Amino acid sequence: MDFPTLSSYLHHHRPGEDILADLHTDPGLGLTAEAVAQRYEQYGRNELKFKPGKPAWLRFLLQFHQPLLYILLIAGTVKAFLGSWTNAWVIWGVTLVNAIIGYIQEAKAEGAIASLAKAVTTEATVLRDGQNLRIPSQDLVIGDIVSLASGDKVPADLRLLKVRNLQVDESALTGEAVPVEKAVELLPEETPLAERLNMAYAGSFVTFGQGTGVVVATANATEMGQISQSMEKQVSLMTPLTRKFAKFSHTLLYVIVTLAAFTFAVGWGRGGSPLEMFEAAVALAVSAIPEGLPAVVTVTLAIGVNRMAKRNAIIRKLPAVEALGSATVVCSDKTGTLTENQMTVQAVYAGGKHYEVSGGGYSPKGEFWQVMGEEVDNVLLDGLPPVLEECLLTGMLCNDSQLEHRGDDWAVVGDPTEGALLASAAKAGFSQAGLASQKPRLDSIPFESDYQYMATLHDGDGRTIYVKGSVESLLQRCESMLLDDGQMVSIDRGEIEENVEDMAQQGLRVLAFAKKTVEPHHHAIDHGDIETGLIFLGLQGMIDPPRPEAIAAVHACHDAGIEVKMITGDHISTAQAIAKRMGIAAEGDGIAFEGRQLATMGPAELAQAAEDSCVFARVAPAQKLQLVEALQEKGHIVAMTGDGVNDAPALKRADIGIAMGKGGTEVARESSDMLLTDDNFASIEAAVEEGRTVYQNLRKAIAFLLPVNGGESMTILISVLLALNLPILSLQVLWLNMINSITMTVPLAFEAKSPGIMQQAPRNPNEPLITKKLLHRILLVSLFNWILIFGMFEWVNRTYDDLALARTMAIQALVAARVIYLLSISQLGRSFLGYVTGKRQTITKASILLLGIAVAIALQIGFSQLPFMNVLFKTAPMDWQQWAICLLPMIPMVPVAILANRLDP
């Protein structure tokens, strides 16, 4: 027997009775043990199923799947075949070091999917064979009758059959901060996920009331499961840096293979021995490969990680460090990211006057200001008017939630909206405990969707009914209203509705408050007591407010040329209001789209909408992913922030996924490239700054490393063409490219940021790794290095008639010149003279640079003076006069370095 799954039917569009009939479920008895066993066999357990990740050994082997490493592996193998085992082991060692570095960098991508299982594991109350049982959520099957109560996590996707004041927090799925009040009525087929009131989805939480539903989807068929499947389909995107390195590597591979083959063919054709020509070809290949570059890149990124950690941004995947610096768009979830995720009363209308309330979140600290008009400053109130006090008092009395002081923070136990009312009353000096003794509650009418209000009966100075609810439900029941001076007049519904409209346009959720005095013998209340005779007390407008520091961060992003787009599951009016408050959307910028509009768009139209608008509301998880992809197709480097399960696929797809470390779900964290430990959007701006600094320093490293490779390659190629002895051997090249280069280049990773780095526009994502200016620099310095190596080698060889000494002095002269070039490159964009005169930075900040130079010098001394190094690298010891000669190239390097800085500032 086949049973429907989530993908088979739109359950919100079908009557509950029809679904029960299709599932052969008796709503009074539930499933039988036999039926449960059959469905276990057909559907399996209610747990998410995932593709297994790559094993560790395979991830390690894949590190060798790089074009440049192919050359080294082949060269080492041929060397071994020819009997040059020392050379072979050194070359293989270089490839192994690079593979280990890459393996360490490998992200734990499978962790994101595995954490989804944790997000939905819970217990459930289920009706089977007429008995209510408490079972693990994994044991649920389609057709089970499940009961929900306050505090429960929804264990599977349910079509609701009965509800009693049921409210569900679906923020992890939809981004909606306010719990959703559930119902059982049929809904239109096109109803978006966030508005399916007759459904309860796996992974959401019950905040209030009770309900009963039938399981219509389990495991991967749930909405949560659909998210996991979409994540499995996501390919881990390359960051701009890794894309550029891949392109650079392939280009370099073709050039190296061509030149090596050309070198071998020309040398052999001129009568050279195949063995010698192979040594020349290997030396050329090894010299052209910047072996130290992967290690330098890793160290530079790791230093960026450390700097970001100090600024509350934890990097999970190293390439994301640099990618942040090239971000052109930040797509942010609203709830809990740009906003506090704590409902806060910000405006009150009472007695015909308007008041603003300061303070954020659930903290009882704040002040009341009377709004005097556009051209007059607001007035801070010393004492509150009676009608304002009465309005606030009603919000606290007519309330089933509580505020708790947890360390430095305040939290609500219960409904967030009621928490906001408690906080606003506490700011006026009211205490829940105090009011409970002064005005004890005698009876209450809980909030119901049919009536849209809650009422409580209290004793005290007479018996009074206090009511809170929607404006529509209370206005029709009110006959009079209190003015500021305590005078009671006939209610002016038109004026109140105008004020409600004004507050709604600010993105505020508005509740109305009223009271009614009853006879002393009144011990209980019913809906009949609320029908007429209410006295209108006022309105309270609340919102999940923007974080103040996030507002500043949005402006900083704009200054840096980065667009900020809000993608949320919230209402469009609320999203637009928040966007305007934060500066995401300018005044008068009305371009905003809802999920239902996006669903009707084709790919081209969607891409244009993603480009033009900065506010997207009522967006489903799949649409968040589509928006990120659309922006990427437009050429943007996209950073996506989020904290809910609904954000996970988009976080994984984005060039940089940014999750909240405190308030975020485990799924979002595991899907991300970066975590914000303080859940502060402002930390993104700091991370972007560090990302730009990382790229700046990587560029310096490339500008320093490649001219050496260029000089070495030119030296070997020209020597073969002219049938001369090789001035430098393959093992000596590896020493220069790995040991010396890494020692001297790593200090560049510690360079401070350039002034005004956050006032620059984002880099063009299509800009190549080697720009024209950088290429000119590389060619100039490569030419100098070739002249230096070749000239020193020829002079020493003719003077001393010693090949080993000639090669040793050529290398030492090159390293001496590199010291000057390093000093110039370390202040790229400024003159070399600026460093000498101390204008660049203090000696303390340059200490790492000087340490790197000192270590490099010590290693070079050992390279030529230690006997075992002479044997391994075929070098020769030098006397002090020869050392002095090797220092002379430092002098001509000064003007070359200055010219290079002018070519590539």
Swiss-Prot record:
Pfam families: Cation_ATPase, Cation_ATPase_C, Cation_ATPase_N, E1-E2_ATPase, Hydrolase. It is found in: Cell membrane. Its EC number is 7.2.2.-. It comes from Synechocystis sp. (strain ATCC 27184 / PCC 6803 / Kazusa). GO terms for molecular function: ATP binding; ATP hydrolysis activity; P-type calcium transporter activity. It is a multi-pass membrane protein. It catalyses: ATP + H2O = ADP + phosphate + H(+). The chain crosses the membrane at residues 60-80, 81-101, 248-268, 283-303, 716-736, 774-794, 809-829, 848-868, 880-900. The active site is at D333 (4-aspartylphosphate intermediate). It is an enzyme of class 7 (translocase). Keywords: ATP-binding, Cell membrane, Magnesium, Membrane, Nucleotide-binding, Phosphoprotein, Translocase, Transmembrane, Transmembrane helix. This is Cation-transporting ATPase pma1. SMART domains: Cation_ATPase_N. PROSITE patterns: ATPASE_E1_E2. Could mediate calcium influx. Belongs to the cation transport ATPase (P-type) (TC 3.A.3) family. Type IIA subfamily. It comes from the Bacteria. GO terms for cellular component: intracellular membrane-bounded organelle; plasma membrane. Its main location: membrane.
